[in-house]
Amino acid sequence: HRAILDADNGTLVVEPDGAQIARVDCQIALSRLHGQQPDPVAALPCLTKGGTAFRLMQTCNLIDNEVPHTQGAAGIGIVRSESAILCEQSEQTQTSRLKEYLRSAEGVPVVLRTCDTRADDDAPWSAELQARLGGDRLFKSQIRALLRAAPEGHLCVVFPMVKDAADWDRCLQEVNDCKDELQSSGVEIGMPMLGCVIDMPSAALMAADIMDRGAQLMVIDAEDLTRYTLGLVHNPTAAVGQLTNPAVLRLVKSVVEQAAARSVPVYICGITVAAVSAMPEYLKLGVRTFSAEPAALLPLKKLLMEQEV
């Protein structure tokens, strides 16, 4: 049997196919290259040939030992929190870890994706995660930990798998319930920026309504949006090759335009090495902030800097 263990991202793939093996080989090669000597491009400003500024953020896991700031990343674009739940971290442990992250970030934005039982259904740990959360929409202790840690820095919290405005309202209600409980107990809290992960076609279509009901940030998970739009849920590796499908780009364009009309920032998140080549199309649609895996940051920066946008 063969397997791919990605300790950086907390994933395990058993019996990987050829595409997955090639992708990992590329990541390993880039990692070795980056470890040999700093690339001078990392220190250059994020500007296209046409003079358009863009911003790079880095993707990481909540259970990582350090807050990474490498290859010119301007902040932490997405912090995945599932690994912390799988390690059975208590509310106090999560609060302490989040405070460490925010203090180490030194004022730059930290965007955390909440744990959701419906997210990443194809991940190896999905069944265990859903069993542990007992079917809850959100993990209450995590929301409480986020509110308690918020005063330490620039925290943004985004909710995945939101299908429409009513679903968004339920997320807000759970946050408000936790806030009321903590305040009534005399616990110091802060209110982070709250946003929505656009990973379902219905969320993209209802983005304007979601923003009108309080979403302050739109984070587009391009690979998941592609999977759900094109019916590739059970073949996730195929989504990477379809990121520029016209149907997907039309949904993204709609979200970007609706967000621009409301001055709401838009991120593209979860960019892997294999997805880098598609990102110029998203730049042309108006996306200016890209959150990428560490190995993808430099290749992405170099490619975007070559664009005439």
Language model feature labels by segment:
Residues 1-7:
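Conformationally flexible catalytic loops at phosphate/diphosphate-handling active centers
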Residues 8-11, 18-19, 61-63:
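Short acidic/polar capping segments at secondary-structure boundaries
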Residues 9, 16-18, 24-28:
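Beta-strand/loop-dominated core regions that host nucleotide or nucleotide-derived cofactor-binding catalytic loops
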Residues 15-16, 57:
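Short linear motifs in exposed loops
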Residues 33-309:
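Conserved alpha/beta-domain cores
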